[in-house]
Amino acid sequence: MDLYGTLGASCARREILTAMFQAGMTGARLNLSHTTLPECASLLEEEFWPAARQAGVEASLIVDLQGPELRVGRLEEPVPLREGGSALLGAGGIPVPRSVVEAARPGDQISLDDSALLLTVEEANPDCLTCRVERGGLLKSRKSLALLGREVDSPTLTAEDRANLAQAGRFGVTHVLQPFVRGREDLLTLRSALAELGLDRVKIMAKIENRRGMEKLDEILEEADVICIARGDLGNSMPLWELPSAQKRIARTCRAAGKPFFVVTQLLWSMEERAVPTR
């Protein structure tokens, strides 16, 4: 069994990473929705890989692309959203992809930061959305965004994704996580991009994050090397009580096909405040 951690500020030192490897971690994920591979050069070359060698672990380095995932743009500082208040998305307000503004209709709901915040669209204009805050909190840059119940057009790979893939060989990337896989074509696009860069040996991990991914699971299984059950956004696409059975259904299908899989999102989240994991 593999055990992956996520690289971040709290574990960005060689001694901490060495201890994590010694405790059983076999690889780490780097979220490229918030950074780039060149920006992480010192973390990878001076901390991560030396820690793996010191611990005697043949580690995996997984890069998590942005892909079709929707995110809030960059904010100069966090924006407080107060329950019952209003929020403007788009021109003159919180930056969001234009495709979201074009797809949204009054009454639609928008979840932010893996459902930590929830908005209802009250008015949809050509360049902005006026929303009511149903569940408030502090919104930070580049947090996830989902227009619930609607599909929003977005490319398999962004320009930033392709730039990061071009650096993957230099930094020893072993696996690529493709978010919001919608079917076979997304994975063929990624595999073609890797082949053009001479990265045929890099493994593809397909993230199942919505109902469309579940519906296309059989064809996704044929093209992916590994399946990732991403509970955060998957939970946004269905009522919460359906999530456990959906997770088990994907796992059962993977086992039947002999396809490796793993589960992510908030597995040890409760330990941010408690000494013993409850989730």
Residue map of PLM features:
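Non-catalytic helical/linker scaffolds that mediate oligomerization, partner binding
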Residues: 1-279
